[in-house]
Amino acid sequence: MGRGRVELKRIENKINRQVTFAKRRNGLLKKAYELSVLCDAEVALIVFSNRGKLYEFCSTSCMNKTLERYQRCSYGSLETSQPSKETESSYQEYLKLKAKVDVLQRSHRNLLGEDLGELSTKELEQLEHQLDKSLRQIRSIKTQHMLDQLADLQKKEEMLFESNRALKTKLEESCASFRPNWDVRQPGDGFFEPLPLPCNNNLQIGYNEATQDQMNATTSAQNVHGFAQGWML
């Protein structure tokens, strides 16, 4: 009569648990050794007890080489499959960006008044509202720029006015400093010039009353003009 089926569950008795662990561990190590010898397989076995004690078996001379081989086989496949996931993610991102670019290009054409036949009434109203808002913003910015330019011109005008007034004041001060030198004159500076004496260059041989009267009139006129010219100087 065969053995009945043993239920697998934690052994509550501590002593029985330790005895069972020792038996099963030895059997597992034996099976690993037999597998490596019979099948020429590279086998590595690592067992930790409930107290943290290490039990190991390796069919090769170094456990680390077997572990490195295991890491290359396990994580290398993950690294190989990872680029495909990154490629898929990049492609999805490309599709999203392409859709955004298409929407922006269509919106740009609509703002230019193109491809409006495909839009509904509601979309046309939204487009009209957007254009009105853009125009108001453009006018506001344009007005602000003009006000800024006007303020700059007013500042330049004030600066020029102040500079002109300073130059005018300096010129008046310079003229005031030179005026006394022109107003004050000494008696012996030659301000009054002597009147020229009348002179008759005609040589008279004989006496003629008409000629004498004409000469007297000319001399009188010369005296008057000479006095006026000297007084004007």
From Swiss-Prot:
Entry-linked InterPro entries: MADS-box/MEF2_TF (IPR050142), MEF2-like_N (IPR033896), TF_Kbox (IPR002487), TF_MADSbox (IPR002100), TF_MADSbox_sf (IPR036879)
Name of a matching Pfam family: K-box
SMART domains: MADS (SM00432)
Residue span(s) of domain K-box: 87-177
Keyword DNA-binding: yes
Coiled-coil residue windows: none
Domain annotation MADS-box: ranges: 3-58
Gene3D superfamilies (UniProt xref): Transcription factor, MADS-box
Any one biological process term the GO annotation gives: positive regulation of transcription by RNA polymerase II
Cellular localisation: Nucleus
GO MF annotation, one: RNA polymerase II transcription regulatory region sequence-specific DNA binding
GO terms for cellular component: nucleus
Keyword vocabulary terms for this entry: DNA-binding, Nucleus, Transcription, Transcription regulation
Primary residence: nucleus
Protein name as it appears in the record: MADS-box protein CMB1
